[in-house]
Amino acid sequence: MDISGMQINEVQSKLKEYYNVLKMARKPDWEEFSMTAKVALAVMFIVGFVGFVIYILMEILPGALK
């Protein structure tokens, strides 16, 4: 088997793996989707707030230490 044949087999193998994952996947119900969205939104707000606090501290502290 030449190199291109091995690459084709690797691609086919990967496609089979992806297909198997898609067969097992299911659409979440509304409750599960809603909870996931709420958690993601809460995490985004927390990360944003922490970044904002760090930004404010970096703006205030240099002036206070002079």
From Swiss-Prot:
Membrane topology: Single-pass membrane protein
Subcellular location: Cell membrane
TM regions (residue ranges): 41-61
Gene Ontology terms, MF aspect: protein transmembrane transporter activity
UniProt main location, coarse: membrane
Keyword line: Cell membrane, Membrane, Protein transport, Translocation, Transmembrane, Transmembrane helix, Transport
Family: Belongs to the SecE/SEC61-gamma family.
Name this protein carries in UniProt: Protein translocase subunit SecE
